[in-house]
Amino acid sequence: MKRSFLYVIFSLFLLLLPIGQTTANSNDSIRLSLLTCAPGEVIYTLFGHTAIRYENPSQGIDVVFNYGLFSFDIPNFALRFSLGETDYRLGVIDYPHFAGEYAYFGRSVWQQTLNLNNEEKAELIRLLQENYRPENRVYRYNFFYDNCATRPRDKIEESIAGKVIYPVEPQDGSRTFREIVHQYCKGHPWARFGIDLCIGSEADRPITQRQMMFAPFYLMDAFAGAQITGDSIQRPLVTDSELIVDATPEEDESFWIPTPLQSALLLFILTAAATIYGIRRRTGLWGVDLILFGTAGIAGCILAFLALFSEHPAVSSNFLLFVFHPGQLLFLP
């Protein structure tokens, strides 16, 4: 009887062993990765993009969690955008469609495989699924502090049992938001001019390495050298990095447009010529005053509106209001 009992127990053990191995192998086959996408040509794509890829081959899952979705069709979009009340949302799309879209627009994509254990993988998946619930997926977008790059970083850090230690950045505390904006607006002078016009002195303060991660490629570089510490064990945050969409950027086929500097020089020359002409003719050219004071006054109205009412970061302390201010409209002829 005793031998029969032991035989039954041993048989059950053999039957359960493959199941346990299958579960472990299934968990081990799950891969979670940080995706970093190259910049595009449209102004809201100039800084690149970040997303999280979730692969579970045993269940046929290969999807991308994307915190960068918004719609121009929402009511009063332009007003809400100027007020800094633009709501973004988390979306989920299958990876082939995601990769195909970026390849179509000539934007490369890099993948960094996250070095998470099974518990951390399960926790990150749970956090993403919880965040994707209809009542949780919408969030108030903030360009510098809460965007499509900072959200994935925060969720990944939240899922890790230990602490993520980022490598010491030589430029930590020496760079500013404005400098990073200039870096990504290279080749787009009017975008740089418009952003420079709107953001104030707060954008010129030195920022930390963590604050630099609002830009996707700064986040990618930080992840590449980051370490996870906990229980006296240290491991890299990223185990593998690869270029998964190798795309050729679209050629710029737009017609020539003068830069802001060229436009300013042209305006100066025309104004000087009109002034000389008016002095020699002993006549006032009210049209010139109308253009100059009208343009400066309208620009001042926009800057004052942003400084007083907008939730956008770094727009309240804008000293350009001393140059462009609404009061100049009072001097219109």
List each language-model region with its residue ranges.
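Soluble extramembrane regions of membrane proteins in the secretory/endomembrane system
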Residues: 25-251
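Generic ordered-secondary-structure signal
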Residues: 14, 142, 323-324, 331
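A generic alpha-helix surface/boundary motif
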Residues: 18-19, 150
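Bacterial N-terminal signal peptides
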Residues: 7-18
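Positively charged n-region of N-terminal signal peptides that target proteins for export
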Residues: 1-7
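Residue-level signal for short amphipathic helical patches enriched in basic/charged
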Residues: 147, 320-321
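Generic low-complexity segments that are intrinsically disordered, proline-rich and/or Lys/Arg-biased
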Residues: 1, 19-22
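N-terminal accessory segments that precede or flank the first globular/catalytic domain
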Residues: 21-82, 237-239, 243-310, 315, ...
